Amino acid sequence: MDYLLDVHTHTIASGHAYNTIMEMAKAGFDKGLKLLGITEHAPMMPGTCHAMYFHNLKVVPRTMCGIELMLGAELNILDYDGHIDLDTRVLKQLDLKIASLHSVCIQPGTRKENTQAVLGAIHNPLVDIIGHPDDGIYPLEYEPIVEAAKETNTLLEVNNNSLNPAGSRKHTRENLIAMLELCKEYKQPVIMNSDSHVFCDVARRDFSGVEVVISSKDGEVLPLVPAVIGLNLFNAIIYISPIL
């Protein structure tokens, strides 16, 4: 299966990543991507860039090293109402916006509170993707999240880093399977991203591949199927998973 885009990556601007925009673009081109999204951590993440950085992204070319770029932010969900940490004026200037739960920005709450936080972000019309909705420290009710994502044309992410055995997120495999079962039922597209913080991880999907993420109830491994969802968000291939 061709992997044409990876729209959740970070550069040195995020404070805990290790390569420049150009180095990440070259890595994406070398791996055959058509589109690379760079989404720096928004300002409430410790060590990341100031809001002015995002405002000034307009000066950066959208084609580099032979690959198309989308430049945006991984926003932090800040409270159980789903507020995020860039204002509307800046958000409207960005190519894409991912909203995610991070423990340095919001403490885990009850399942109801965590779900409300994600739903608040989904219902923000400027949010395009919910990032890594799989971390077990934030228990979630997936059915209302999938329903709201379908209603608002918001993509849910299958995050390669989440399934890395060396990673810090908990119970990600079972959470993703639960989410993807509902995505199939509701015909809700999901998007596969690397969440790369270093050039060599761009376009990686080894942990989020079929062998790891998707299996039927009797253990049979089923493939991810590429589906073109019109223009949708990126005018590219989005992945929807038949998992039952």
Regions found by a protein language model. Give the residues of each.
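Histidine/acidic-residue-rich catalytic or RNA/ligand-binding cores of hydrolases
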Residues: 15-18, 48, 139-146, 166-180, ...
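Alpha-helical scaffold segments that flank or form the walls of functional sites
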Residues: 22-36, 56-63
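Anion (oxyanion) recognition and catalysis
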Residues: 29, 149-150, 184
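Short acidic/histidine-rich active-site segments
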Residues: 188-202
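Extended substrate/RNA-proximal surfaces in nucleic-acid metabolism proteins
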Residues: 2, 42-158, 162, 214, ...
